[in-house]
Amino acid sequence: MSDLDYLFKNPITVEKNASLSHVIAELLKNNISRLVVTDEKSSVGIITEKDIGLFLLTEETEKNLDEIQVSKIMNALTSVKDSENVENCVETMLEKRIGSLGVLKDDELVGIITKTDIAQHYSKNYSENHRVGDVMTISYVSMNSNSTLREVVSKMISEKISRIFLKNDNDEIEGILTFRDLFHVALEQGNSDSVLDNTDQSISVVFTRNGFLSDSGFGNTVQAKDVMTSNFASIDFDQDLAGACDVMIKNKINGIGVNINGKLGGVVSKTDVLKAIHIENSSK
């Protein structure tokens, strides 16, 4: 039995002709960041919340989300055989800059392995090998929490990031804003008759884009601090990286703040955990 047999999970799937609104609802309902896309039970691609977030905020179409099929924005699913070892999976994910791999048995998709699964593997097998500070990302993107949602979303688009830290006037971290937070806002605002004179229960892409980014949209009147997640996880830079994995897994998040002398000094993410395993691979 290979390492992957203990790690991979049965994928949550969606048909390629499913609507974007259905996909968003499934992501939020299951508290996950990606779905495998199928065509008559055969896997044909993958869709992530980051793919959807960037699409919603940059695409020029005026179609409703109910009219857009997931096949229009899905990406190819890279897969490995179920006999592959975890270390080689890590190298593939880093090389291709992807967050998940399909797992094949006899050319049939039997599961999916994600960075969360890799973090679980690290926590179990690499305890005390690395401190958080060894692999953390020193730089992070932040804005003032009093900024409008429009300003913050514009920054996320220009930086092509899915999360941003928000600080108060004393340069202290108050919270974090993610695409998942924006999905909730879009769905709530989309069902409000008073927003942008929108009386259609269906949410259009142009409504979402204009709502967040136009002068007249709700994004220009709502402050980021009103929709941010205030309680976010953090860890000290000198702690065991395995402990950071446990925190991310427990909170179902992809990254946490790293404290240096009591202040946020950077971020450690599941991608950094993959890099730690890469370091181990390179030293063998």
Residue ranges and their predicted role:
Residues 7-11, 20, 43, 76-77, ...:
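Short glycine/proline-centered loop/turn elements that form peptide/ligand docking sites
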Residues 1-10, 48-78, 90, 114-142, ...:
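Tandem CBS (Bateman) regulatory domains
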Residues 12-22, 41-47, 78-83, 107, ...:
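Short N-terminal helix-initiation segments at or just after the protein's N-terminus
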Residues 27, 35-50, 93, 101-116, ...:
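A glycine-centered beta-loop-beta connector
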Residues 13-31, 38, 79-97, 104, ...:
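The conserved cystathionine-beta-synthase
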